[in-house]
């Protein structure tokens, strides 16, 4: 067990170095993070390291509770848990590695065109009216701008305290703030676009994330990753709640329609039989 724990600690360190090495690696990580936005940065990093295409991870008791079982032979995704005695491991499994004997599925929210207006309205209620309402993508980009402006300050203060020894050390405070804020905003927007089914490469290129190279120590990258993960989660949870509410309303209406149709059919049959 200790050997496994050590290997996961080293894996986290290795992936930390990899995603800060270039913008391509970093964007690949952001794609995984988008589908696992409820996890913190370290968990996202380890999910990316072990199963980069994971889209819905949970512990085995969650899957069992919802009538699903983990496929035999599946290796869990090991995550680190802080304790008073150091780290311990816990394991999560992606939904793609589970099945249900009863054919039960768990709804994973998906953005659909018919939901967009309601989602935009929900975001405006939280983050203010958008100057550009031309589409969902424009509203997500504006949301990222507003929410980062409101929340990046505390993370920046932490970053100033640990930037010594990194490439950021060569920058003055204004440049550090500008680079950090811009990178967080682009990263949050990238995650939101990705999770909402919009190709982020229509709005970003590798150059937008080039400064990740300067976050070349575990401390600086941890603050960057923590800021991005924490800030992106807020609007995405709101979007998820809105979309799932709309989806469940549709399901109820469909069931009601089906029940009424069945009732009308049954009543019609009864009348016909009586007339015969």
Predicted regions and their residues:
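N-terminal accessory/interface modules of nucleic-acid-binding and processing proteins
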Residues: 1-276
């Amino acid at each position: 067990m200790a050997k496994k724990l050590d290997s996961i600690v080293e894996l986290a360190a290795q992936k930390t170095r990899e995603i800060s090495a270039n913008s391509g690696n970093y964007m690949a990580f952001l794609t995984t993070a988008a589908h696992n936005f409820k996890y913190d940065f370290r968990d996202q990093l380890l999910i990316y390291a072990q199963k980069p295409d994971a889209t819905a991870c949970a512990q085995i008791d969650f899957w069992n509770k919802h009538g699903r079982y983990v496929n035999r032979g599946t290796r869990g995704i090991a995550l680190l848990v802080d304790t008073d005695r150091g780290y311990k491991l816990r394991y999560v499994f992606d939904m793609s590695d589970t099945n249900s004997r009863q054919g039960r599925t768990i709804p994973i929210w998906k953005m659909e065109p018919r939901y967009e207006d309601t989602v935009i309205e929900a975001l405006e209620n939280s983050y203010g009216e958008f100057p550009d309402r031309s589409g969902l993508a424009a509203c997500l980009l504006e949301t990222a701008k507003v929410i980062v402006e409101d929340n990046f300050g505390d993370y920046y203060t932490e970053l100033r305290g640990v930037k010594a020894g990194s490439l950021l050390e060569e920058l003055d405070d204004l440049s550090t703030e500008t680079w950090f804020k811009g990178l967080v905003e682009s990263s949050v927007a990238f995650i939101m676009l990705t999770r909402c089914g919009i190709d982020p490469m229509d709005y970003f290129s590798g150059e937008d994330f080039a400064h990740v190279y300067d976050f070349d120590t575990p401390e600086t990258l941890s603050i960057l990753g923590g800021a991005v993960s924490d800030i992106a989660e807020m609007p995405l949870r709101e979007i998820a709640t809105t979309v799932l509410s709309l989806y469940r309303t549709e399901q109820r209406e469909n069931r009601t329609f089906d029940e009424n149709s069945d009732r009308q059919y049954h009543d019609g049959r009864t009348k016909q039989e009586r007339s015969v």
